[in-house]
Amino acid sequence: YKGEVLGLVGQSGSGKSTLIRSIAGLVKPESGSIYYDNRDIVRADQKDLHAIRRKIQMIFQDPYGSLNSRFVAGRIIAEPLINYGLMSSADAFKRVRELMELVRLDPAWINRYPHEFSGGQRQRISIARALALEPEILLCDEPVSALDVLIQADVLNLLKDIRSRMDLTMLFVSHDLAVVRYIADRVAVMNKGEIVELKSAAEIYSNAEHPYTLQLLDAIPIPDPSIESKRISF
């Protein structure tokens, strides 16, 4: 639904990344359709795909590998604005500074290269770049899995804040159910390329029904040994 965060969970190889990359138009599925704004992304020509990508942006798992190491932060964030020819260089520079402030990066760092930032800061650059075109949908492909726990919390809180401010719809992919529980309104569980369960985040954790979902929940680490010993085994 518009304005919600839909979590997509499943083990490695379940098809999560393939699905999200298909929605982004980065890979073409062998069959089926993906509709956005009454247009089939799978069968869209380059012109339509270019227009669709303006409204659907993506944050990748690796905050370093997804950034061009030859560009400074300001150029990286401005790249979508340049590619779509939406504003002059002066206006783009101003917009970049606004985006850096939005993702809680010091605009004074605008001329730093990716290697001069921490992992969490690099992911904030990726988020700023994804927001440059003011998309309607933000695809998040394991955006915090490469970060340590404290930085994960900071980035998740940032995404929640941005979602509220911009009325964004998010598809948040993760293998970590604790992370998804924190950020998602609803959760879809994927196994072998199929959605096997779809419920509100609260219901998934309190009233899961599918055996695969129960198995994922059972795999969440619990620090209390007395509780750990009572886990269900499959």
Where are these regions (language model features)?
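Conserved ABC ATPase "signature" region
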Residues: 90-108, 217-218
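Conserved ABC ATPase signature
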Residues: 113-117, 121
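Helix-to-loop junction immediately C-terminal to a conserved catalytic motif
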Residues: 24
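A short, proline-enriched helix->beta-strand linker immediately N-terminal to the Walker B motif
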Residues: 132-136
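Short catalytic/signature loops enriched in Gly
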Residues: 200-234
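Conserved ABC transporter NBD signature motif
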Residues: 32-40, 52
